[in-house]
Every structure is written in C-alpha cells, then in structure tokens.
C-alpha cells in the first residue's frame, strides 16, 4: 500500500503502525461469489462498488447490484467506508489497492485475496522499531499538510 497518502487499512496512529510492524498483518477477503449469487449478480455488484467511489459505472447494473452489497457490508460497512479494525478498505474513495474497474472488482469478489505483511519484531531491535515507526508515520504526516 501507499504509505504516504494518509489512508490506512489498520489505522495510522504511531501505536497502530508499531503494532503492524511488530506483529505483522494478514489481510483476508474470502471469495464472496457464492454469497452474492449468479455471475450476473457479481457483475452488477461490481458496478455498485464502482458507483460508491464515483467511478465510471453502468447505472442500471449498479442499481441491480445494490441489494447484493449486503454480502460485503459485514466487513466494508453498510456505507462502504470500510472498517480499520478488520483491515477492510474504504470502497468510497479512489484508492484501489488491487486494481480498478469491473474486471478487477469481479475477480476480487470471485477469488478473494490474501495478503501478508510479516512481523518484524524478531528482526528489529526496540530502537529500530521506534525509528521505523516514526519514519512511516512521518511519511504521511508531513508538517504543514492539512488533513
């Protein structure tokens, strides 16, 4: 992920950054096609997800896919804004970690995705973890930046 834009999956506080560095993270989105329905339902849902961020989409497909979003809401929230506690991304912004567009979203719904950031606690000293935490936090919290 981009560490400079201030959009964090698990929280961008120094404490959360350090926790991520020490313990690592496993991101898991299971395949959701069976919960969504038919391949046509998955395609419609993909257009609804695109609509959440104002991305180009087919309005009719998006309206048909809206009711299928219930399968996504447990992790991404009913509003699609994500849940940092789960590492579920915000679907209403223009940040697409694993590709953008109908094909990429459909593939994610059909196949799911597992990512891992390995724990660094066995590789770094306490001092190194502190310095790295400050560095990563500072990359997205530059002096004078308005947020």
Predicted regions and their residues:
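Extended non-catalytic domains of envelope/secretory-pathway proteins
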Residues: 8, 43, 51-54, 66
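Axial heme c-ligation environment in periplasmic c-type cytochrome domains
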Residues: 2, 22-42, 57-60, 86-90, ...
